[in-house]
Amino acid sequence: MAFSCFDKFSYTYCYQCMHGPDGCMVPSRNGEGTELYAHSEELEAKLRELARRGHMEIEKELALEKKTYGSHIKILILGGPLSGKSTIFKQMQIIHVDGFKTDQELIQYRGLIDNNIRDIYLQLIAGSRVVGIPLDPIEHITYEIDEIYAPMSDAFSVRTISELLEPLTEFWNSKQIQEIYKRRCEFELLDSTKYYLENLTRIADPTYLPNQEDIVHSRKATMSINSIVFEYTGVSLLMIDVGGQRSERKKWLHLFDDAKVVLFVIDLTGYAKRSEESRMELSRFPKFFRDVGSNAYDMKVALKIFNEVAAASALANAVFLLFFNKVDLFKEILSQVNLQPCFSKFDGENTYEETSKYICEKFIRAASSKKSVFPHFTTATNTENVKLVFRACMESVFKANAKATGLS
């Protein structure tokens, strides 16, 4: 079956724990019950039946998919916690497919952005307690905001953000919140905080519908495996985002043994953040507090994941693309947080040039010398930057494939 760059492919897989609470995406502790189903109305009945079968049946189903889409170059997106995997995926939809343009999509993302802004507010409030900056001087503002937010449910149907424009703007511009924001690495805070709060006047307009940049900045925990097909320079690519599949990778990674490319995304600011990967994106709401004392640095977690993925026999023949993401935020944080606490052997200057080089070398060394690894630095929220970096990546992939097949 042939696809062109004008075809929109939205066949979505999801691996779900059959033992966890309320449809939790965390695999069960005894390692049993990982089932496969597809979010598609047409296939719902078929895949309900599939969910009752075992792993052998699942693999047979995937084998059929491989035959159907065997002509595509399969690109698997993996990475560390909150690294921007889904942002890259959205950019591919914008650049190479048809983006997000339907009324239904725009209204859904508008609701998500409203929720993101509420989460940002709550995270900043929680952050004040973490960093020890009291909010007494702006208590009247937070009281007004709380009064408006209090009746809201998760899926509020009536937009009230226009009522919040004035108090939220005053809240964001306050001395206390700006000081808390400077110390954002010490607590959980959405990367889109500054972007959304500085665009609040536009977003709060009653006629507002998000543009593509607004959508790229939006944040929603990825609980499923999403895929798109698009053409690039005459070659058909199948890109798969495995963002929500956190634990026990060895149990599902072999299902993608025909992937030609692994696009591994790393959050450069992760050197300054501590987290626990297994709980990072699996809770209903963002985690407002970080337990700094007991968790590893995000970047150390990402390095461990990359080492595991690079050593996986299922991906032995894949080309690895390293996307060192959030360059813009990384440069900001470098002036406040040194690299050495995360990497004790780093003895260079805390400049962008020296720190980025050191981090890049750490990841390259984590892969076998026989691996084809191509590092790239990017800002995933910048569409033009992603477009240029992806072009450079695919040139590397095509050259590596030509070399492997003796065509170069």
UniProtKB/Swiss-Prot annotation:
Keywords: GTP-binding, Magnesium, Metal-binding, Nucleotide-binding, Transducer. One of its GO terms (molecular function) is GTP binding. Residues 378-383 are annotated as: G5 motif. Mg(2+) binds at residues 86, 222. GTP binds at residues 39-46, 79-86, 201-205, 216-222, 241-245, 285-288, 325-328, 380. PROSITE patterns: G_ALPHA. Residues 214-222 are annotated as: G2 motif. It comes from the Eukaryota. Belongs to the G-alpha family. G proteins are composed of 3 units; alpha, beta and gamma. The alpha chain contains the guanine nucleotide binding site. Interacts with the dopamine receptor dop-2 (via C-terminus); the interaction is direct. This is Guanine nucleotide-binding protein alpha-14 subunit. It comes from Caenorhabditis elegans.
